[in-house]
Amino acid sequence: MNYSTIKYCDIANGEGVRTTLFVSGCRRRCPFCFNEEAWSFTAGRLFDDEARQAILASLEPAYIDGLSVLGGEPMEPENQHGLVSFLETVKARYPEKSIWCYTGDTYEELTSGPKRTEDTDRLLSFIDILVDGPFVQDLKDITLRFRGSSNQRIIDMAATRATGKVVLWTDDPVFSTHTMN
């Protein structure tokens, strides 16, 4: 698996201050994608041990809230395989840090569609928040937090796993599905 970029101290792609990994490779190719340069599976650099260790070290400070994974497309089968053991390591080392994952696929497509692989369920088990659905230019809304178009959902994966149905995440402190640190 390759990656196009690693951003440290990112505040745009999930709650709080985060490290963000942009994987390479996307077959969906949404019109008006903000990250076209990551469509090729060979874009960027190899996601090797040096890159993994740099990300793990970047998650150490208390002010870093977690890791966000974007693309390209993290849920391409090749990328699922490349990410599953790494996200397992992140969760084991930093259980208090959240993992956000952005995908152009819907949760339903991932759990019962052609993108489901032998790695999918395990990969999803390490993800705290899944932002799903393709970016749709006609539904673009710059007032939305953490997503680009209104068709995209922010899914609370722990609540979804517990109930067996999609539970949306909310950052409203009164009706939140998550606890604040």
Q: Language-model segments: which ranges?
A:
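Short glycine-rich, flexible loops that bind phosphorylated cofactors or substrates
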Residues: 76, 138-139
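N-terminal [4Fe-4S]-dependent radical SAM core
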Residues: 1-22, 31, 35-42, 166-174, ...
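Glycine-centered loop/turn positions within well-structured domains
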Residues: 28
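Conserved Radical SAM active-site core
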Residues: 2-3, 17, 32-118, 122-123
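Residues at the C-termini of beta-strands that transition into short coil/loop
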Residues: 7, 103, 134, 158
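P-loop/Walker A phosphate-binding loop and immediately adjacent motor/lid segment at beta-alpha junctions
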Residues: 83-91, 140-181
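Receiver (REC) domain switch/active-site residues of two-component response regulators
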Residues: 128
